[in-house]
Each structure stands twice: as C-alpha cells, then as structure tokens.
C-alpha cells in the first residue's frame, strides 16, 4: 500500500513501555484514530494488515502488541498465551488505554475520540475497553470472547457499538450474541448486532480456513461506515 507509512512504535501503558504497529495515511492530516486489537495468535501479519487497510481508508491505526513480541501459529501455544493474558486482563486493558492515549496525543489524529476494534480474544477486549476505558468514540468487537460482561459493565458503555458474530461460531455462539444484544437494549446503548448466517469463528481472517470473503467484505464496510459516521464527522 504505497499511500500509507508503517512502522513499529513504542508507547507507555500498564506502567511499562509497549510496542505497536502504527499505520498512517500519507498526505495532510489530521485523520481519525483506530486501535486494532489482536487475536490470540499475537501481533502477526493479518492484524498488521488490518491496521494498514485502515490507514489506506484514511485512519491512523495502531495495533498494540499484547504478547511482548510473542507470535505463534500453533493453537495450543496460542491458547497458553491467551490464558496467560486472561489472568492479567486488567493489565491488557491498561496497555490498550496506553495505545488509545498514544493516538489521542498524536499530532495527526483528530478528533480525540478513538475507534476500537478487535477479533476473537481482541473482540472480548474490545467489549471490556468500551465499558471501562476512556476516549473511545466507537467500538466494533468481532466474535469477542473472554471474561463475561455484567449488565453493570454494559451500562457503562458510552460509545456506539457494532457487534459482529457468526451463526456457525461454536465458541462465541449466537446465544452469546443475543445475550449481549439484550443487555445493550436494556442499557439503551446505541448499537447494532449482526449475526452472519454462514460465518464461522474467525471468518474475517483471510489467512484462516474459516475465512468468508463475502461476509468479511460486508463487515469491513459496515465497520468503516460506523467509524466514519462517529469519528470523521465529529471533527
């Protein structure tokens, strides 16, 4: 993508220095900012590519490394890494807050409300970020698992939510999707819940067997539309 620049950056969060993949459009800013939260594999090529796609669409995108450099393609190892992170969920959220703060402070980012999206484990973190972190302008969790959200947590969400699920997902089931939808309805959270009928878990990841190109393309356009409506037009 010749119309963007990318590099690894350092930012402060959770009381330490963290690394992240930053993708920025070329040309004159400012642009809205988006944090992209990894799956359980780590900060690998697919997540970096999602950040790059955001930059090509006119966003400054930062994908924080929640595993401190560890990346795997083996499910057993990914599960171990994810379980370790889950035991330090609040620390991971603090790193994500650091990534949000980095974008808020970035000269080329405006407005100072940041979009957040994540996939699988990152989807779960997106839910919790929307409920617990500051400076979030919109949230798009993809098939987000992780620690359950209570109705009290959901009631703290202040930003619009686009919640994306797959009907064939055996891990984060349609029942979970419907439960989250009911909680957002009760809390009067502006939201849309989409359960794609022919989509499995990880349908957005074009490096995985579950990838569904048509569904992924539709989800991408819906996500861009939300971020443009809530972030770009508020400048």
Residue map of PLM features:
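C-terminal catalytic histidine-bearing segment of alpha/beta-hydrolase fold enzymes
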Residues: 185-235
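Short beta-strand/loop motif that positions the catalytic acidic residue
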Residues: 157, 163-165
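Acidic catalytic loop of the alpha/beta-hydrolase fold
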Residues: 168-172
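Short alpha-helix in the alpha/beta-hydrolase fold that links the catalytic acid
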Residues: 173-183
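A conserved short beta-strand
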Residues: 135-145
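Alpha/beta-hydrolase fold nucleophile elbow
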Residues: 108-119
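Gly/Ala-rich beta-loop-alpha elbow adjacent to hydrolase catalytic centers
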Residues: 118-122, 126
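Serine-hydrolase catalytic machinery in alpha/beta-hydrolase-like enzymes
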Residues: 7-109, 202-208
């Amino acid at each position: 993508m010749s119309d963007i620049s990318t590099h690894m950056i350092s930012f402060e969060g959770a009381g330490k220095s963290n690394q992240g993949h930053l993708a920025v459009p070329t040309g004159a800013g400012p642009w809205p900012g988006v944090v992209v939260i990894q799956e359980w594999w780590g900060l690998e090529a697919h997540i970096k590519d999602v950040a790059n796609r955001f930059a090509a669409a006119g966003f400054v995108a930062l994908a924080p490394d929640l595993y401190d450099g560890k990346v795997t393609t083996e499910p057993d190892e990914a599960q171990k890494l994810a379980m370790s992170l889950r035991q330090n969920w609040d620390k991971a959220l603090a790193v994500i807050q650091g990534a949000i703060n980095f974008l808020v402070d970035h000269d080329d980012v405006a407005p100072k409300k940041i979009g957040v999206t994540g996939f699988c484990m990152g989807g779960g973190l997106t839910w919790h970020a929307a409920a617990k972190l500051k400076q979030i302008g919109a949230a798009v969790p993809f098939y987000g698992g992780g620690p359950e959200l209570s109705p009290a947590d959901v009631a703290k969400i202040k930003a619009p939510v686009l919640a994306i699920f797959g009907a064939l997902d055996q891990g984060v089931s349609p029942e979970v999707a419907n439960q989250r939808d009911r909680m957002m309805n009760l809390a009067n959270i502006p939201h849309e819940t989409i359960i794609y009928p022919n989509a499995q878990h990880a349908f957005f990841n074009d490096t995985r067997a579950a990838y569904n190109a048509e569904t992924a393309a539709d989800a991408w356009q819906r996500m861009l539309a939300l971020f443009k409506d809530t972030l770009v037009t508020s400048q």
